[in-house]
Amino acid sequence: MDNRPIGLLDSGFGGLSVAKKVIEKLPNESTIFIGDNAHIPYGDRTREDIINLTRRSVKFLLEKNVKLIVIACNTATAVAMPTMQKEVEQQIIGVIQSGALAAARTTKNKNVAVVATNVTVASHAYQKEIKFRDPEIKVTELAAPKLAPLVEAQKDYATNLKVVKESLAPLMGKEFDTLVLGCTHYPLIQKEFEEAINNKEVTILDPADQVAQYTFNVMRRDGLFSDSEKAVHEYYTTGNSETFDKLARTFMDDDTLTSKHVDTENY
């Protein structure tokens, strides 16, 4: 047994989509989430920037004595995770491997589309992971740099839908039956994706469920389950805590959720 918390990090709000599934899957586990909202978006930054910013959040979580870390950010998983795994003793779990596995299992016509940030698409991380599982699957990758900042800006549904439709336009007419939301921000506007795609034959895939299951499996394997009867969930942001709380309370269905501001510059 290990009663230390699970650490989760993201470039901003997006990782809440993963945190929510992890909490649902592991209700006895305490969690600490940090969103680096001050430096969003990661998807347009250099490789060096992404590694350094991810390292700061990892160090912050380690200072909080977490037992494992979930990088709840596709861009950070694609770019920084290999480096972090070399630098840190704790198990580090990313989101891309789980998303790719879910996509390979879901597609029936072996035609998958992935929408993600510029950096994630440029890394071809999803394409590599999906084809590793099934080389016959055709993977179409689409960069949508406007979408993560859109979620952070907390716009209304109509505005979101317009930008999602514009971003997905290059996919219209393609024969994919599975669309991977390759950025953890995107599930926060999944309804807009569903309306924009408007095709019941297409499965819109949020990798968070698979990430939560993999986290469960790792903890069972390594004997990391908590025997605590009451889980505690802490939220931190490098941005404005009031802005963070507004979206987080709605998405996490918790009116009492209160985050704390943290400056990771010195980590």
UniProtKB/Swiss-Prot annotation:
Locate the active site.
C73 (proton donor/acceptor), C183 (proton donor/acceptor)
Tell me the route in metabolism or biology where this protein functions: Cell wall biogenesis; peptidoglycan biosynthesis
Database matches in Pfam families: Asp_Glu_race (PF01177)
Extract the GO molecular function terms from the UniProt entry. Answer: glutamate racemase activity
What EC identifiers does the entry list? 5.1.1.3
Q: Kindly state which keywords UniProt assigns to this record, in alphabetical order.
A: Cell shape, Cell wall biogenesis/degradation, Isomerase, Peptidoglycan synthesis
Please provide the Gene Ontology terms (biological process) for this protein.
cell wall organization; peptidoglycan biosynthetic process; regulation of cell shape
Give the transmembrane region(s). none
Entry keyword Electron transport: no
Residue sites binding substrate per the record: D10, S11, Y42, G43, N74, T75, T184, H185
Tell me what this protein is called. Answer: Glutamate racemase
Lineage of this protein's species?
A: Bacteria, Bacillati, Bacillota, Bacilli, Lactobacillales
